[in-house]
Structures are given as structure tokens and as C-alpha cells.
Amino acid sequence: MSDAARLLAEIHAARALVRDGLRDAKASARPDHARLWAHATRAPHGPVDLATVRAIRSDPTTGRRYRTMLGALALAHAPLAAAASDGAIVRRRVGAFALEILEAADGAPPLLVLRSEAGQMPRVIEAWLDDETARLDLGAATEGAVVLALDPAVPDAALLGRMLRDPACAVFLL
């Protein structure tokens, strides 16, 4: 075998090894079930594993696994929701729950009102729109409703309000 042929064979072998190594590295970079579960059940405003977040956003398979897990955990969820607005109120239906965004006047922040006639109220809301996500604690219910201020000074609350107005936003009530 000539030197040129041997060198060409070595280049092809090295390329195949690198390609296989990258494929194996990508598969091993996917978070396991326990890491996805820990991320799905985390407290709002708690620490997050950035490697898990990166995998959820960049790998479609991991993103689907995570959203499936959230859907199983959720009291109600809507992968896509139809939103209706008369200019002052935005309403969404998510399972047995009704979400309304009430625009406030006189400089007050808009309010998210979550109502249900079911007995159990969710504790957390998580919304997904494209590669953005917002997760907030809903607090305690009062007379079958939860009210959350979507204060523009609070980045997560403002992001949630903007996302909920988009019909393509996925909503999980946990």
C-alpha cells in the first residue's frame, strides 16, 4: 500500500471515529429520567441545572420527554390553547381551569386570575413558548380563585403575562 493510500485510509478511519464519538457524546449528554424529574418538580425560583435546561432547549427528544413528564404531573395542561380577547381581558381554558388576564388601570400591574370549580388548585404554573419558559408559584387559593400580579418589574411575571397572551403558548398547571 502506498503512503498516499495509507494516509487516506487513516484519515477516513479518524473521521469515522470522531463522528461516532460525537454521536456517543451527544447521547450521553442527554439528562437521565431522574434529572428530568428533579427539574420538573423543582420549586419556582429555585436553583436549576443549566445542563438540563440546555438539553431540554437544544435536543428535541429531551424537550418532548420533559413536556410529557410535565403533562403527567400537571393537574391540567394545554399544549396549545385558543386565546380570546376583547381588548381588556384575555381568557384561556386549561383543563378544568379558567385563566384570565385582567388589564389594570392607574399604573397597577395586570392580574392573572385562575379559577376552578374542582377541589384541588394548582400550586405552580409553567408556560412554554418557543425556547422561553416561565415558572411561577401561584400561592394559596381564596374562594376557588388564585390571583397573581403580573408586575412588569418582576421579569418572570412579565414574561408569563406576555407568553399567556400568545395562543401558541403551552401551559402546565402543577
Residue ranges and their predicted role:
Residues I89-L174:
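C-terminal, beta-strand-rich globular interaction domains
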Residues M1-R67:
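N-terminal amphipathic alpha-helical interaction or autoinhibitory segments
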Residues K26, R64-A105:
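Transition segment at domain starts
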